[in-house]
Curated annotation (Swiss-Prot):
It is found in: Plastid, Chloroplast thylakoid membrane. It is a multi-pass membrane protein. It comes from Populus trichocarpa (Western balsam poplar). One of the components of the core complex of photosystem II (PSII). It binds chlorophyll and helps catalyze the primary light-induced photochemical processes of PSII. PSII is a light-driven water:plastoquinone oxidoreductase, using light energy to abstract electrons from H(2)O, generating O(2) and a proton gradient subsequently used for ATP formation. This is Photosystem II CP43 reaction center protein. InterPro entries: PS_antenna-like, PS_II_antenna-like_sf, PSII_PsbC, PSII_PsbC_sf. One of its GO terms (molecular function) is chlorophyll binding. Residues 1-14 form a propeptide. PSII is composed of 1 copy each of membrane proteins PsbA, PsbB, PsbC, PsbD, PsbE, PsbF, PsbH, PsbI, PsbJ, PsbK, PsbL, PsbM, PsbT, PsbX, PsbY, PsbZ, Psb30/Ycf12, at least 3 peripheral proteins of the oxygen-evolving complex and a large number of cofactors. It forms dimeric complexes. The modification N-acetylthreonine is found at residue 15. Gene3D superfamilies: photosystem ii from thermosynechococcus elongatus.
Length: 473
């Protein structure tokens, strides 16, 4: 048996790869978890768990800083950001750093500063993580009772929840302060094709802000993803930041009510499952936001949305054929519907052809040409500006349809370029990661509930059918 390539062939299912391996003095016998179960070995060691989390934060911030500097080093100011595979610089540009009218990058120094600040921060976090993982106290309860905790201590858990909520609220207000006082943010709707501006007239009306939550998620409604002006976005952050901070204070000052103590499972794994569930929801919402919303994610930096690229194509050929003498108001297409313009089911004038399904797109280059009943024929004949033509021609050939082999744009479009839109990447990655987090939520929720009910040991291997079957060899 010792001559076999792998001894694992003869081991029952739940045995370790190597039961004798002890990392940092923590083996399976003392912790109940094997080395590969990672932080599960630290469930009751608050000091070591702190080290793991701080080190993890250091890795995250290190990636942000290093990737930021990598993008700065490769950045070509003459090309749009979305043609260069950038995912971090568009976020910095959206916050108003380094850009001017039309989303043109006029200064890359703020991007360099951002990368360096993140790298320096990651070094501090990395040092703290290593210190607490290797040198600091194993548990914090004795030396630093404020930072210590027991998972079953419901009052302490809600206090920690409160502190987290306050930090999230402060984060929301950082965006508010940037938009109000520190140079403003990039507004894709600014006249003439977008610019950085300070937001002065916040939307604080609760009926407007919470009205988004009551909208249908379908069609022209679009739930919160339909937000299309910065006053609402920044005003929403004022509301959200205030709710988080007030909720945080509430959770610090109060103890959980009896119904909450009964309804929830109070264990480390349960809290992990709640957190994973919340992150999954964030991931799914972020996916929809980056895919459809061109206000929070301006097309100048992230490339056009799918509907936007499609409408841009219809607009581009309307402009071309109108110059060649076509009467765009009455020309019929092959199906008998309008070739360039038609009416939506509710009567608005919209672009004809295949792009009719995207008729509720709103984009800054197109809205000036609308009247009270949809697209205005007289404006289409007299008011089209060169910047609108240039932008739509550019967006037409940059549809966010790129596959992994980088054949970007519409596959049959002869003017398409080799590129994958950051919108495709950000939407897909957040959906996939959100899905994985959701599966993790179900897994850990099931384990936590089973443990609370007292049967977490899993299947009894003594009566497994395979044990009574003839060995394969």
């Amino acid at each position: 048996m010792k001559t076999l390539y792998s001894l694992r062939r003869f081991y029952p299912v739940e045995t370790l790869f190597n039961g004798t391996l002890a990392l940092a003095g923590r083996d399976q016998e003392t912790t109940g978890f094997a080395w590969w179960a990672g932080n599960a070995r630290l469930i009751n060691l608050s000091g070591k768990l702190l080290g793991a989390h701080v080190a993890h934060a250091g890795l995250i911030v290190f990636w942000a800083g290093a990737m930021n500097l990598f993008e700065v080093a490769h950045f070509v100011p003459e090309k749009p950001m979305y043609e260069q595979g950038l995912i971090l610089l568009p976020h910095l540009a959206t916050l108003g750093w380094g850009v001017g009218p039309g989303g043109e990058v006029i200064d890359t120094f703020p991007y360099f500063v951002s990368g360096v600040l993140h790298l320096i921060s990651s070094a501090v976090l990395g040092f703290g993580g290593i210190y607490h993982a290797l040198l600091g106290p194993e548990t914090l309860e004795e030396s630093f009772p404020f930072f210590g905790y027991v998972w079953k201590d419901r009052n302490k858990m809600t206090t920690i929840l409160g502190i987290h909520l306050i930090l999230l609220g402060i984060g929301a207000f950082l965006l508010v302060f940037k938009a109000l006082y520190f140079g403003g943010v990039y507004d894709t709707w600014a006249p003439g094709g977008g610019d950085v501006r300070k937001i002065t007239n916040l939307t604080l009306s609760p009926s407007v802000i919470f009205g988004y939550l009551l909208k249908s998620p379908f069609g022209g409604e679009g739930w919160i993803v339909s937000v299309d002006d910065l006053e609402d976005i920044i005003g929403g952050h004022v509301w959200l930041g205030s709710i988080c901070i007030l909720g945080g204070i509430w959770h610090i000052l109060t103890k959980p009510f009896a119904w909450a103590r009964r309804a929830l499972v109070w264990s480390g794994e349960a809290y992990l499952s709640y957190s994973l569930g919340a992150l999954a929801v964030f991931g799914f919402i972020a996916c929809c936001f980056v895919w459809f919303n061109n206000t929070a994610y301006p097309s100048e930096f992230y490339g056009p949305t799918g509907p936007e690229a499609s409408q841009a194509q219809a607009f581009t050929f309307l402009v071309r054929d109108q110059r060649l003498g076509a009467n765009v108001g009455s020309a019929q297409g092959p199906t008998g519907l309008g070739k360039y313009l038609m009416r939506s089911p509710t009567g608005e004038v919209i672009f004809g052809g295949e792009t009719m399904r995207f008729w509720d797109l709103r984009a800054p280059w197109l809205e000036p040409l609308r009247g009270p009943n949809g697209l205005d024929l007289s404006r289409l004949k007299k008011d089209i500006q060169p910047w609108q033509e240039r932008r739509s021609a550019e967006y037409m050939t940059h549809a966010p349809l790129g596959s992994l082999n980088s054949v970007g744009g519409v596959a049959t479009e002869i003017n398409a370029v080799n590129y994958v839109s950051p919108r495709s990447w950000l939407a897909t990655s957040h959906f996939v990661l959100g899905f994985f987090l959701f599966v993790g939520h179900l897994w850990h929720a099931g384990r936590a509930r089973a443990a609370a009910a007292g049967f977490e040991k899993g299947i009894d291997r003594d009566f497994e059918p395979v044990l009574s079957m003839t060995p394969l060899n």
